[in-house]
C-alpha cells in the first residue's frame, strides 16, 4: 500500500540521522500517525533534524 511504502521511506530517512532512541521513536510515531506521510513531510522532517544540529548523512553526500 502507499502508506506502507511511505512508512518505509520514513524509516530509511530517519535511520541515518544521529537521533537518540527516544527521538527516533517519537519521530516514527508521529510519522505513522500521519497515514499518508507525504514526501514533503519527510523532507521537512529531515531539514528540521538538520537544523536542530543533528549530524545528517544522506545517500550520495560526503
UniProtKB/Swiss-Prot annotation:
Protein name according to UniProt: Zinc metalloproteinase-disintegrin-like BaG
Keywords: Cell adhesion impairing toxin, Glycoprotein, Hemostasis impairing toxin, Hydrolase, Metal-binding, Metalloprotease, Platelet aggregation inhibiting toxin, Protease, Secreted, Toxin, Zinc
Note: Negative results: has no effect on alpha-2/beta-1 (ITGA2/ITGB1) integrin. Does not have hemorrhagic activity.
Description of post-translational modifications: The N-terminus is blocked.
Function text: Snake venom Zinc metalloproteinase that inhibits ADP-induced platelet aggregation and inhibits the alpha-5/beta-1 (ITGA5/ITGB1) integrin, a fibronectin receptor. Has caseinolytic activity. Induces the detachment of cells that are bound to fibronectin.
Protein family per UniProt: Belongs to the venom metalloproteinase (M12B) family. P-III subfamily. P-IIIc sub-subfamily.
Activity regulation field: Inhibited by EDTA, and 1,10-phenanthroline.
Domain Peptidase M12B: 24-54
Expression tissues: Expressed by the venom gland.
Cellular component GO terms, alphabetical: extracellular region
EC number: 3.4.24.-
Cofactor binding remark: Binds 1 zinc ion per subunit.
Annotated active site: 51
One Gene Ontology biological process: proteolysis
Subunit structure: Dimer.
Location (main, coarse): secreted
Positions glycosylated per UniProt: 29
An annotated Gene Ontology molecular function: toxin activity
Cofactor requirements of the protein: Zn(2+)
Superkingdom: Eukaryota
Location of the protein in the cell: Secreted
PROSITE patterns associated with the record: ZINC_PROTEASE (PS00142)
Residues that bind Zn(2+): 50, 54
The keyword Cell wall biogenesis/degradation appears for this protein: no
Amino acid at each position: 500500500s502507499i502508506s506502507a511504502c511511505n512508512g518505509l521511506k520514513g524509516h530509511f530517512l530517519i535511520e541515518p540521522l544521529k537521533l537518540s532512541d527516544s527521538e527516533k521513536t517519537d519521530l516514527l510515531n508521529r510519522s505513522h500517525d500521519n497515514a499518508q506521510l507525504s514526501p514533503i513531510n519527510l523532507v521537512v522532517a529531515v531539514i528540521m533534524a538538520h537544523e536542530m544540529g543533528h549530524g545528517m548523512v544522506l545517500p550520495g553526500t560526503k
